[in-house]
Curated annotation (Swiss-Prot):
The keyword Aminoacyl-tRNA synthetase does not apply. Residues 117-168 are annotated as: Disordered. This is Single-stranded DNA-binding protein. One of its GO terms (cellular component) is nucleoid. Pfam families: SSB. Keywords: DNA-binding. Residues 123-132 have a biased composition (Gly residues). NCBIfam families: PRK07772.1, ssb. Gene3D superfamilies: Nucleic acid-binding proteins (2.40.50.140). It comes from Mycobacterium leprae (strain TN). It comes from the Bacteria. GO terms for molecular function: single-stranded DNA binding. The keyword Hydrolase does not apply.
Amino acid sequence: MAGDTTITIVGNLTADPELRFTSSGAAVVNFTVASTPRIYDRQSGEWKDGEALFLRCNIWREAAENVAESLTRGARVIVTGRLKQRSFETREGEKRTVVEVEVDEIGPSLRYATAKVNKASRSGGGGGGFGSGSRQAPAQMSGGVGDDPWGSAPTSGSFGVGDEEPPF
Protein backbone atom coordinates (compact mmCIF):
# COMPACT_ATOMS: atom_id res chain seq x y z
CA MET A 1 0.00 0.00 0.00
CA ALA A 2 1.08 3.55 -0.62
CA GLY A 3 2.69 5.17 2.36
CA ASP A 4 3.62 1.92 4.09
CA THR A 5 7.15 1.63 5.42
CA THR A 6 8.81 -1.27 3.59
CA ILE A 7 11.83 -3.06 4.98
CA THR A 8 14.17 -5.84 3.90
CA ILE A 9 15.80 -7.93 6.62
CA VAL A 10 18.57 -10.49 6.30
CA GLY A 11 18.97 -12.65 9.38
CA ASN A 12 18.36 -15.99 11.05
CA LEU A 13 15.13 -17.54 12.32
CA THR A 14 15.26 -17.77 16.11
CA ALA A 15 12.80 -20.70 16.23
CA ASP A 16 10.76 -22.88 13.91
CA PRO A 17 7.93 -20.89 12.30
CA GLU A 18 4.63 -21.29 14.21
CA LEU A 19 1.75 -22.27 11.89
CA ARG A 20 -1.73 -21.45 13.19
CA PHE A 21 -5.18 -21.07 11.67
CA THR A 22 -7.73 -18.35 12.33
CA SER A 23 -11.33 -19.26 13.18
CA SER A 24 -12.18 -18.66 9.51
CA GLY A 25 -9.48 -21.13 8.42
CA ALA A 26 -6.82 -18.69 7.17
CA ALA A 27 -3.26 -19.90 7.80
CA VAL A 28 -0.83 -17.56 9.56
CA VAL A 29 2.79 -18.11 10.52
CA ASN A 30 4.62 -16.04 13.13
CA PHE A 31 8.39 -16.06 13.45
CA THR A 32 11.26 -13.90 14.66
CA VAL A 33 14.29 -12.92 12.59
CA ALA A 34 17.53 -11.99 14.36
CA SER A 35 19.67 -9.65 12.29
CA THR A 36 23.17 -9.12 13.64
CA PRO A 37 25.45 -6.55 12.00
CA ARG A 38 29.16 -7.28 11.62
CA ILE A 39 31.40 -4.48 12.88
CA TYR A 40 35.11 -4.09 12.17
CA ASP A 41 37.14 -3.39 15.32
CA ARG A 42 40.14 -1.31 14.20
CA GLN A 43 41.98 -1.84 17.48
CA SER A 44 41.94 -5.62 17.31
CA GLY A 45 41.86 -5.78 13.51
CA GLU A 46 39.00 -8.29 13.46
CA TRP A 47 35.30 -8.45 12.74
CA LYS A 48 32.87 -8.76 15.66
CA ASP A 49 29.13 -9.16 16.07
CA GLY A 50 27.19 -5.98 16.75
CA GLU A 51 23.98 -5.78 18.75
CA ALA A 52 21.29 -8.10 17.34
CA LEU A 53 17.96 -6.70 16.18
CA PHE A 54 15.02 -9.06 16.72
CA LEU A 55 11.98 -8.46 14.50
CA ARG A 56 8.69 -10.32 14.90
CA CYS A 57 7.18 -11.22 11.52
CA ASN A 58 3.93 -12.70 10.22
CA ILE A 59 2.85 -14.08 6.86
CA TRP A 60 -0.58 -15.30 5.77
CA ARG A 61 -2.45 -17.93 3.75
CA GLU A 62 -0.67 -20.25 1.29
CA ALA A 63 2.64 -18.45 1.75
CA ALA A 64 2.36 -19.14 5.50
CA GLU A 65 2.00 -22.85 4.87
CA ASN A 66 4.96 -22.80 2.49
CA VAL A 67 7.11 -21.08 5.13
CA ALA A 68 6.10 -23.61 7.81
CA GLU A 69 6.98 -26.51 5.49
CA SER A 70 10.25 -25.04 4.22
CA LEU A 71 12.08 -23.07 6.91
CA THR A 72 13.42 -24.05 10.32
CA ARG A 73 15.22 -22.54 13.29
CA GLY A 74 18.62 -21.12 12.37
CA ALA A 75 17.83 -20.75 8.67
CA ARG A 76 19.30 -17.59 7.16
CA VAL A 77 16.47 -15.77 5.38
CA ILE A 78 15.76 -12.65 3.37
CA VAL A 79 12.46 -11.03 4.33
CA THR A 80 10.71 -8.13 2.62
CA GLY A 81 7.60 -6.63 4.14
CA ARG A 82 5.84 -3.67 5.71
CA LEU A 83 6.47 -2.35 9.20
CA LYS A 84 3.25 -2.19 11.21
CA GLN A 85 2.68 -0.85 14.70
CA ARG A 86 0.11 -2.65 16.85
CA SER A 87 -1.15 -1.74 20.31
CA PHE A 88 -2.75 -4.12 22.77
CA GLU A 89 -3.53 -4.51 26.46
CA THR A 90 -2.01 -7.27 28.60
CA ARG A 91 -4.04 -9.43 31.00
CA GLU A 92 -2.76 -7.18 33.77
CA GLY A 93 -4.25 -4.14 32.01
CA GLU A 94 -0.94 -2.67 30.81
CA LYS A 95 -0.96 -1.03 27.38
CA ARG A 96 1.77 -2.26 25.02
CA THR A 97 2.84 -1.31 21.53
CA VAL A 98 4.85 -3.54 19.23
CA VAL A 99 6.34 -3.07 15.78
CA GLU A 100 6.03 -6.11 13.51
CA VAL A 101 6.75 -6.95 9.88
CA GLU A 102 3.86 -8.05 7.67
CA VAL A 103 5.83 -10.22 5.26
CA ASP A 104 5.32 -9.86 1.52
CA GLU A 105 8.20 -12.11 0.41
CA ILE A 106 10.54 -14.51 2.19
CA GLY A 107 13.18 -16.94 1.05
CA PRO A 108 16.35 -18.66 2.15
CA SER A 109 19.60 -16.76 1.77
CA LEU A 110 21.91 -18.61 -0.59
CA ARG A 111 25.03 -16.78 0.52
CA TYR A 112 26.20 -19.66 2.73
CA ALA A 113 23.79 -22.42 1.65
CA THR A 114 22.14 -24.11 -1.30
CA ALA A 115 18.48 -24.89 -1.79
CA LYS A 116 16.28 -26.90 -4.10
CA VAL A 117 13.06 -25.03 -4.79
CA ASN A 118 9.85 -26.87 -5.63
CA LYS A 119 7.03 -24.80 -7.10
CA ALA A 120 3.84 -25.12 -5.05
CA SER A 121 1.06 -26.68 -7.11
CA ARG A 122 -2.19 -24.83 -7.63
CA SER A 123 -5.54 -26.54 -7.31
CA GLY A 124 -7.85 -26.41 -10.31
CA GLY A 125 -10.21 -23.50 -10.74
CA GLY A 126 -9.71 -19.80 -10.61
CA GLY A 127 -8.12 -17.54 -8.18
CA GLY A 128 -4.65 -18.92 -7.40
CA GLY A 129 -2.53 -17.12 -4.90
CA PHE A 130 -3.45 -15.36 -1.70
CA GLY A 131 -7.21 -15.39 -2.34
CA SER A 132 -7.56 -19.15 -2.02
CA GLY A 133 -7.44 -20.54 1.47
CA SER A 134 -6.94 -24.15 0.39
CA ARG A 135 -3.76 -25.97 1.29
CA GLN A 136 -1.59 -27.16 -1.57
CA ALA A 137 1.40 -29.45 -1.34
CA PRO A 138 4.62 -28.66 -3.17
CA ALA A 139 4.84 -30.15 -6.64
CA GLN A 140 7.68 -32.57 -7.20
CA MET A 141 9.88 -31.61 -10.11
CA SER A 142 10.66 -34.58 -12.32
CA GLY A 143 14.17 -33.39 -13.08
CA GLY A 144 14.28 -35.32 -16.35
CA VAL A 145 16.40 -33.91 -19.16
CA GLY A 146 13.35 -33.97 -21.45
CA ASP A 147 11.51 -31.58 -19.13
CA ASP A 148 14.43 -29.19 -18.66
CA PRO A 149 15.40 -27.14 -21.73
CA TRP A 150 18.73 -26.28 -20.05
CA GLY A 151 19.48 -29.86 -19.03
CA SER A 152 20.96 -31.07 -22.32
CA ALA A 153 23.73 -30.14 -24.75
CA PRO A 154 22.82 -27.72 -27.57
CA THR A 155 21.47 -29.27 -30.74
CA SER A 156 23.56 -29.12 -33.90
CA GLY A 157 23.18 -25.87 -35.75
CA SER A 158 22.54 -23.90 -32.59
CA PHE A 159 24.58 -20.88 -31.57
CA GLY A 160 27.69 -21.43 -29.50
CA VAL A 161 29.23 -24.36 -31.36
CA GLY A 162 32.72 -23.85 -32.78
CA ASP A 163 33.69 -20.54 -34.38
CA GLU A 164 30.17 -19.40 -35.26
CA GLU A 165 29.20 -15.76 -35.20
CA PRO A 166 26.32 -14.65 -32.99
CA PRO A 167 22.91 -14.81 -34.70
CA PHE A 168 22.35 -11.05 -34.35
